[in-house]
């Protein structure tokens, strides 16, 4: 289909239409739960849900109070085969809503969203539409939190969709022509209301095409083989595009050094059956240490299905403390959870 004919990096440009779009900061964030259908830059309909912060926990901690004061929203990017209606994603939303307003959505090809999954490429456009929606609702600060495939998407989104300072020239180079990575450059020139103020990548891969674990070999079978795509469609409610990437999109580890000065938190479990620990360490090594933190969580498995409430609470607290803060050094060490 034409909606998946080229990579996301070449399509990130103005003109996105979202339900209820408006200029950031024109009104206070909504206090009413909302369900809507967003429209991405390439015309895919995305099922999205808005959950206001849980008022009963408004006084639980200082971070929640600060989040409410500056209008923070956390946008949740689920893993492959997930959707906003999955119990694990709902649980993440409920925990995060103790700290901030929350937007969940279903990636293309998942749940009630349209299109077909490109397994991390065009999904960046889905996330951008959700972030724009958050800002159109009045949120002055937005954090993104992604799990597994969603983790790769939040990394790429943060690198490719940047808030540009006032007066920044849009030329690709001194001569105004196309420089290295021109498709990524065009995406970074995308509308600034789609940028994020803090990034959390949980159980994210560093590299594409990883097949080093049995779990990932099963995932590749589901993606690349007709029988696997059939099982994914009817067994996992995930519709996968049959075409290979062309061109291959920017990988998470290539995106990592482009994220600063946006704060970045990488979270990974020492019992992850999909991506071993060299993946988070590769992301840490590639990212700017002044703006990056790594949490290695003992006993944690993979993504939202395995994330305990205590970890989700800490992630939400980190996001409320970092999003909206003026760029500064946050430390670059490794923290064992």
Residue spans of the language-model regions?
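Short beta-strand element of the alpha/beta-hydrolase
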Residues: 70-79
């Amino acid at each position: 289909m034409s909606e998946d004919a080229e990579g996301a990096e070449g399509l990130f440009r103005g003109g996105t239409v979202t339900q209820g779009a408006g200029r950031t900061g024109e009104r206070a964030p909504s206090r009413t739960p909302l369900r809507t259908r967003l429209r991405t830059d390439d015309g895919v309909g995305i099922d999205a849900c808005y959950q206001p912060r849980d008022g009963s926990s408004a006084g639980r901690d200082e971070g929640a109070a600060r989040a409410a004061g500056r209008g923070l929203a956390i946008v949740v990017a689920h893993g492959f085969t997930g959707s906003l209606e999955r119990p694990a994603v709902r649980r993440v939303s409920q925990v995060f809503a103790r700290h901030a307003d929350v937007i969940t959505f279903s990636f293309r090809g998942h749940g009630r969203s349209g299109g077909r999954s490109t397994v991390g490429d065009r999904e960046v456009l889905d996330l951008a539409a959700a972030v724009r929606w958050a800002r159109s609702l009045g949120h002055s600060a937005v954090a993104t939190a992604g799990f597994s495939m969603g983790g790769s998407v939040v990394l790429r989104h943060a690198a490719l969709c940047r808030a540009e300072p006032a007066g920044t020239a849009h030329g690709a180079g001194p001569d105004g022509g196309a420089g290295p990575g021109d498709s990524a450059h065009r995406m970074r020139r995308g509308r600034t209301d789609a940028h994020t103020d803090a990034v959390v990548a949980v159980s994210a891969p560093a590299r594409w095409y990883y097949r080093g674990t049995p779990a990932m070999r099963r995932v590749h079978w589901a993606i690349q083989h007709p029988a696997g795509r059939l099982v994914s469609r009817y067994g996992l409610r995930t519709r996968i595009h049959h075409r290979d990437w062309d061109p291959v999109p920017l990988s998470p580890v290539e995106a990592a050094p482009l994220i600063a000065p946006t704060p970045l938190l990488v979270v990974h479990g020492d019992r992850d059956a999909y991506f071993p620990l060299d993946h988070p360490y590769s992301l840490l090594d590639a990212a700017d240490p002044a703006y990056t933190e790594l949490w290695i969580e003992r006993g944690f498995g993979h993504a939202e299905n395995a994330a305990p409430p205590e970890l989700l609470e800490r992630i939400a607290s980190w996001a409320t403390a970092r999003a909206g803060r003026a760029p500064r050094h946050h430390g670059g060490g490794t923290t064992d959870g």
